[in-house]
Curated annotation (Swiss-Prot):
The gene is Cox4i1. Residues 1-22 form a transit peptide. The lineage of its organism: Eukaryota, Metazoa, Chordata, Craniata, Vertebrata. Coiled coil: none annotated. It is found in: Mitochondrion inner membrane. Belongs to the cytochrome c oxidase IV family. It comes from Rattus norvegicus. The chain crosses the membrane at residues 99-124. The modification Phosphoserine is found at S56, S58. The modification N6-acetyllysine is found at K29, K53, K60, K67. Residues 125-169 are mitochondrial intermembrane. One of its GO terms (cellular component) is mitochondrion. This is Cytochrome c oxidase subunit 4 isoform 1, mitochondrial. Residues 23-98 are mitochondrial matrix. The modification N6-succinyllysine is found at K29, K60. Component of the cytochrome c oxidase, the last enzyme in the mitochondrial electron transport chain which drives oxidative phosphorylation. The respiratory chain contains 3 multisubunit complexes succinate dehydrogenase (complex II, CII), ubiquinol-cytochrome c oxidoreductase (cytochrome b-c1 complex, complex III, CIII) and cytochrome c oxidase (complex IV, CIV), that cooperate to transfer electrons derived from NADH and succinate to molecular oxygen, creating an electrochemical gradient over the inner membrane that drives transmembrane transport and the ATP synthase.
C-alpha cells in the first residue's frame, strides 16, 4: 500500500507540467527559453521583443504620442522611444572595451610565472649539463662514427670524403 502510494506520487510529480518549481522553500519561476527574449547583438540588430517590457505611465503616454505624426515629437522624445525599444545603439555596441588589456595582462602574468618556474627548475631541480654535450666530446664522437663508417650509403658517413679527410662539397 505504501509502495503504490509512493509510486503514484512520483508518477504525478514526474508527469506534472507546472511552470513553478520549488527550491529552498520558495517558489521559483522556471525560464521558458521558447519565448522571444531581448538581446543586444550586432549580428542580430532587431530583437524580437522590446527592451522595456513594463511601461511606466509617462512611457505609455509617449507610445500613444508616437502613433501620431513623428514631426511633432522632440529629439528627446525620439531618444526615449528608442531607449524603450533598444538598450544600446550601434555606436554603443561597437564601442571598444578594455577587455583586451585584461587578457594581455593575464597572458603576460602566466608567461612571467612560467619563466620564473623554469629558472627555478634550472637552478634547483636539474643537475649540471652532461659532459657529452661538450664540444670536444661531440668532436670525438663524430670522429668515432666516421671511423666506424656509420650509415655509409645515405647518412652520416656518405657526406665524408675519406681520401681528403674533409666533408664533401
Amino acid at each position: 500500500m505504501l509502495a503504490t502510494r509512493a509510486l503514484s506520487l512520483i508518477g504525478k510529480r514526474a508527469i506534472s507540467t507546472s511552470v513553478c518549481l520549488r527550491a529552498h522553500g520558495s517558489v521559483v519561476k522556471s525560464e521558458d527559453y521558447a519565448l522571444p527574449s531581448y538581446v543586444d547583438r550586432r549580428d542580430y540588430p532587431l530583437p524580437d521583443v522590446a527592451h522595456v517590457k513594463l511601461l511606466s505611465a509617462s512611457q505609455k503616454a509617449l507610445k500613444e504620442k508616437e502613433k501620431a505624426d513623428w514631426s511633432s515629437l522632440s529629439r528627446d522624445e525620439k531618444v526615449q522611444l528608442y531607449r524603450i525599444q533598444f538598450n544600446e545603439s550601434f555606436a554603443e555596441m561597437n564601442k571598444g572595451t578594455n577587455e583586451w588589456k585584461t587578457v594581455v595582462g593575464l597572458a603576460m602574468f602566466f608567461i612571467g610565472f612560467t619563466a620564473l618556474v623554469l629558472i627555478w627548475e634550472k637552478s634547483y631541480v636539474y643537475g649540471p649539463i652532461p659532459h657529452t654535450f661538450d664540444r670536444d666530446w661531440v668532436a670525438m664522437q663524430t670522429k668515432r662514427m666516421l671511423d666506424m663508417k656509420v650509415n655509409p650509403i645515405q647518412g652520416f658517413s656518405a657526406k665524408w670524403d675519406y681520401n681528403k679527410n674533409e666533408w664533401k662539397k
